[in-house]
Amino acid sequence: MAEIDDVLQALLSSTGASRVTLRQDLPGDYAFPVTHEALAAGVRSLKEERTVDLRTQPVALEMAAGRQVVQDDSARAYDDPAFHRMRETYGGLAAQIVTPVLADGRTVAIVSLHQLGSPRRWTEDEIEACTAAAARVGQLL
């Protein structure tokens, strides 16, 4: 859907981050696959990545509870070894804002804004932009 791609690209452009993904709760063997993404130059796609089991990731558990996660320094966020393997698999994930898309109180999709390489301090405007992007995606789904 081109409108969803436009929302993700606008979020990427306004923040100067590395990657924005939309994961949707779809039928199948892999929980919340990436269905749409916007990438900065040279950043690897996650659309075909299937080695990370999101059902056990601490951030995914927060999404299931309907809570946004803001990490300025993902390396310090959790002690969980699987989380740190995911960070490396995702290209050196250093900071992120992860926002649930809710419908009838249930998480139906997830918008993730990733910064690769080095931590970064997210601004209130960037956090609000993620919230607004997730709300807009929810309207489009």
PLM regions and their residue ranges:
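A short, aliphatic-rich beta-strand micro-motif
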Residues: 94-102
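Signal-transducing coupling segments at domain and membrane junctions
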Residues: 74-95
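Short coil/loop residues immediately preceding or within conserved phosphate-binding loops
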Residues: 17, 96, 108
